[in-house]
Amino acid sequence: MRLTPLLAALALPLLTVLATPLTPVGEAEVVEVDVAPRQISLNPASSCPKGQLWCCVSLDLVSNSLIAGLLVTLGILDPTGINTAGVQCTPLSWPFQMSCGNKDLCCDPDLPVVGLLLKLNCRSVNPLL
């Protein structure tokens, strides 16, 4: 069988794919992405409601009031949990539970005395924040 120019043109990409080494199963290829760390300026006493422990997640969309209003209207966001820093907080169950899952910020009281919470201390659990 003779190779025609059409078959030769089709065979070249196939050979290129077959010659590419595959990543072994179980080994993930590490791809570095140039992402600048985001800074969130929080006043912990005002960003997290007092009286409870809270897990907080940063919401970039909330910086746009039109989008935030639309999300609240659609019932996607709870307006009571959104503050001016663009952070939405949800309460943790008592007693002091510090597992925030995939949230960005953990908030806990500086003085963990039940009934006497002077301010909340929010710390980042996301290295990009």
Swiss-Prot record:
Compartments, record wording: Secreted; Secreted, Cell wall
Subunit and partners: Self-assembles to form functional amyloid fibrils called rodlets. Self-assembly into fibrillar rodlets occurs spontaneously at hydrophobic:hydrophilic interfaces and the rodlets further associate laterally to form amphipathic monolayers.
Family that this chain belongs to: Belongs to the fungal hydrophobin family.
Cystine connections: 48-106, 55-100, 56-89, 107-122
Keyword Acyltransferase among UniProt keywords: no
UniProt name for this protein: Class I hydrophobin 11
GO molecular function: structural constituent of cell wall
UniProt xrefs under CDD domains: hydrophobin_I (cd23507)
Any one cellular-component term (Gene Ontology): extracellular region
Record's keyword annotation contains Heme: no
InterPro entries given in the database record: Hydrophobin
Signal peptide limits: 1-19
Gene this protein is translated from: Hydph11
Top-rank lineage group of the source organism: Eukaryota
Role this protein plays: Aerial growth, conidiation, and dispersal of filamentous fungi in the environment rely upon a capability of their secreting small amphipathic proteins called hydrophobins (HPBs) with low sequence identity. Class I can self-assemble into an outermost layer of rodlet bundles on aerial cell surfaces, conferring cellular hydrophobicity that supports fungal growth, development and dispersal; whereas Class II form highly ordered films at water-air interfaces through intermolecular interactions but contribute nothing to the rodlet structure.
Keywords linked to the UniProt accession: Cell wall, Disulfide bond, Secreted, Signal
